[in-house]
Structures are given as C-alpha cells and as structure tokens.
Curated annotation (Swiss-Prot):
Name of the featured protein: Phosphate import ATP-binding protein PstB 3
Keyword terms of this UniProt record: ATP-binding, Cell inner membrane, Cell membrane, Membrane, Nucleotide-binding, Phosphate transport, Translocase, Transport
Domain ABC transporter: 15-254
One Gene Ontology cellular component annotation held by this UniProt entry: plasma membrane
Organism of provenance: Trichormus variabilis (strain ATCC 29413 / PCC 7937)
Enzyme Commission number(s) from the entry: 7.3.2.1
Family according to the record: Belongs to the ABC transporter superfamily. Phosphate importer (TC 3.A.1.7) family.
Annotated positions binding ATP: 47-54
C-alpha cells in the first residue's frame, strides 16, 4: 500500500488521480495510482526504469491517447473535471497542460516562429511580438536570442533549445507544465540553467517533472512521488506508487523501506 501524505494541505489541488490503472493492450503498466498534484509547486516522479513515471505523466495531458493499445481505468481530475470524460477535447487538455520532452525538439522554424506558431493555431489575437518576448524572458532565453529571432531554432545549443521548448510551452498559456527528464540530454551548466528556471516558473505554473536524477529531484521539487516496479508471473512488469510526500521527508525520513533503499542508492 502506497503512503500518500499531503503535507501541503493548504495548497489547492490541480490534478487528482483516483484508482488509475493503465493498460497497453492486455499488459497492465500502472496499477492503483492515487495522487494529488498541488498548485504552483514542483512535483517530482522518481523510480527505476519501467515503473511508469512517464506513462503517468502522459496521462495528465492525454498524450497516451496517441498509442493505439492504450487504455485507462480510473479517473484523472483537473480542477474537479474528469479529463477522460467523453465530452473532453484532448487538444484543449494539451493546451492547458503543456509538455517538455526528454530531448529538445524545436520546430524547424525561426526562433520567433517556434514561439508564435502554437499561439497562432490556438487563436491568439494579441500582440505577437510582446508574447514572443515575454515567453522567451520567462524561459531565461531572451537576452541570448533577441538579436537573432529570425535564425533557426535548430541553430541554438542543446540547453538553449530546451529553454526554447519551455518558452514554446509557456506561449500557449498553460496552467501546468509537464517535464519528462528535461535535462537528461544536457550538460551540467545547461542543466543548472533549467533547474533555476524551474524554480522561477513555479511562481506562475504547476510543474510535474520526471527525473532519474535523485539529486535533481531533491534540488528542484517540493513534493516527490517514488514509484517502483514488480514482476508478474508471466514476465511482465507493473508500476505502482510506493510513497508520496514532501521532498524533504522522502529523502531524509521516508516511511517505506523500499523508498529508503532507493534514495540511498541500494537499488535502482
């Protein structure tokens, strides 16, 4: 049984997961997930490979829907509305809940158009120049690119490209930003810039980050969820939530032995 202790009782819940089971065909990938994501906090998902961290992350903006064999049972609420209800438009979900992927993936467009494109297709009618500048400033990239906005986004360094992708996500004015190992392809200096940016962004956004780097989780997050995986008799692997608590508690005083073993490096 997972320990799910909310130490942020005064904080509004943005996402609420209730008894979520995720299948790919007949294969059960995630089992019995109960988890509340607090507003304007950074929540980290940690755990060994194959435990379902990224699968759960993609449930929040329904990216898993693009996988034909995907099926979800249970409920995921966004401000009390079930994201998997029949009347919910997945495209609108993805506008409100943005995504930054493991490897930087800027469009093969100019830096300016990387930011403007999503806003245009979402019907933005305001001052586009101001939106582009504001988004790049929020992503701590404006000063580095303000004189080359018409150059290709692909001309930037890896760290700059990832911040461009964060700016692109910000431009469509989401409420939540999901980050799937956003620093795994970056050098240490670029990683530090992104971590500093995460601290700044949580003033305006709710952030959920998947990371294999436990030191990173300890540095950037307010809450941490530890997932583990158990083998089945048929050779499958089922991910499950072991413990969810304030990050300080997870790393300094975990309640579950498996959590203690993982954060101390005994397995994983």
């Amino acid at each position: 049984m997972a320990t799910n202790t909310s130490t942020l009782n005064s904080t509004e819940t943005v996402l609420k997961t209730e008894n979520l089971n995720v299948y790919y065909g007949k294969f059960l990938a995630l089992q019995n997930i109960w988890l509340d994501i607090p507003k304007n906090k950074v929540t980290a998902f940690i755990g060994p490979s194959g435990c379902g961290k990224s699968t759960l992350l993609r449930c929040y903006n329904r990216l898993n829907d693009l996988i034909e064999s995907f099926r979800a049972e249970g409920k995921v609420f966004y401000y009390g509305k079930n994201l998997y209800a029949q009347d919910i438009d997945p495209v609108e979900v993805r506008r409100r809940i943005g995504m930054v992927f493991q490897r930087p993936n800027p469009f093969s467009k100019s830096i300016y158009d990387n930011i403007a494109y999503g806003a245009k297709i979402n019907g933005f009618k305001g001052n586009m120049d101001e939106l582009v500048e504001r988004s790049l400033r929020q992503a701590a990239l404006w000063d580095e690119v303000k004189d080359k906005l018409r150059q290709s986004g692909l001309s930037l360094s890896g760290g700059q490209q990832q911040r461009l992708c964060i700016a692109r996500a910000i431009a469509v004015q989401p409420e939540i930003i999901l980050m799937d190992e956003p620093c795994s392809a970056l050098d240490p200096i670029s990683t530090l810039r992104v971590e500093e940016l995460i601290h700044e962004l949580k003033e305006q956004y709710t952030i959920v980050i998947v990371t294999h780097n436990m030191q990173q989780a300890a540095r950037v997050s307010d809450m941490t969820a530890f997932f583990n995986v158990r083998p089945t008799e048929t050779g499958g692997r089922i991910g499950y939530l072991v413990e969810y608590d304030a990050t300080e508690s997870i790393f300094n005083n975990p309640k579950q032995e498996d959590t203690r073993d993982y954060v101390s490096g005994r397995f994983g």
